Amino acid sequence: MLAPCSGWELGCFRLCLRQVRLWAGAGRWACWACQARPYSSGGSERWPGSETEVPPPGPGRRTLKEWTLQVSPFGRLRARLPCHLAVRPLDPLTYPDGDRVLVAVCGVEGGVRGLDGLQVKYDEDLEEMAIVSDTIHPQASVEVNAPLKFGLDIKSSGSGCVKVQSIEGDNCKIETEHGTSILQSVKGQKLHVQTKGGKVICLGTVYGNIDIHASDKSAVTIDKLQGSSVTVSTEDGLLKAKYLYTESSFLSSAAGDITLGSVHGNITLQSKMGNITVDSSSGCLKASTNQGAIDVYVSQLGKVELKSHKGSIIVKVPSSLQAHLQLSGKEVDVNSEVHVQEMAEVRKDDVVTVTGLMNQASKREKWIKADAPKGTVSFRRQSWFQSLKLQD
């Protein structure tokens, strides 16, 4: 008898769907979502993240084939699959030496083709665990338990989704075509995620030097990123992050909006067509958009430079902030609740420039510069408590 597919596979995706729905609004899931149970609301059943598009669960999925291989604890996993893949660490109590890889293929019994073409092997010289197939059914799923410090090199084709949970290898590389990539509580020196048409979702805290690129209409949603260097880019999709704790971050989108919660460090934001929103900035912030609007709360100041070529800018600050101000736009509105000393106004070529000081700022590097030549610059007071947006 073949055992049922592990509860971790289904349970973790139920958790992901709940978190994604609450934070990311991720919409339709093409992968394991169809296996999770619907939940009831108001007497009717609904699916997390999509009320109409996700099909009802099919017959029970079972473990169809299993492998256990002895490996180096510091090797790497190379996977090339057209189906779903989930990777998590070995149980340290069961495998204290961390020298095994467990592989299981799950699917509807008798309904998964291409198992004979699935290669599962370990190369001792390269210290590389390979899982490769181009014939396995796209609705199958491969579950891997690997050593905690394993590196990852994963490519999925078609609609194959990838989830990596709690792995701490030096290098983690994930590439998908149309499947969703999920990183949950992952640590590494270098983390690279790329998708041509799927979503990228980071749950918990993801540590490392991080590079995420999402093409076409792919969205990127993030709980928390922490590391020295972070680069995240989208084309037409939303880029949304709750927390960034980095030395240097560069986030960009061609046409999608950039929506950030609390950010710390040197942050650069660029969007050609989309809007930029930052709930709280602590450090240096440089944000620019061609046609979109900018809305920023500056909680602690390094140097802030904001530019919207055709849109408007809203800058919110606490009353205690010390800063030099230079606000330029077709119109400039400084709220009366903000006390600005030495305020001066200059008009030239249909552009108004207002300069001044907040709270007798003495350090010249503490600047807020906002430039919206075709729009309005609004400067207003907001408390830190208001920035938390608890009503949401």
Swiss-Prot record:
Protein name in UniProt: Protein FAM185A
Secretion signal span: none
Annotated spans, Disordered: 39-60
GO cellular component, one term: mitochondrion
Record organism: Homo sapiens
Organism lineage string: Eukaryota, Metazoa, Chordata, Craniata, Vertebrata
Superkingdom, natural source: Eukaryota
InterPro entries: Toastrack_DUF4097
PANTHER family: PROTEIN FAM185A (PTHR34094:SF1), PTHR34094
Name of the encoding gene: FAM185A
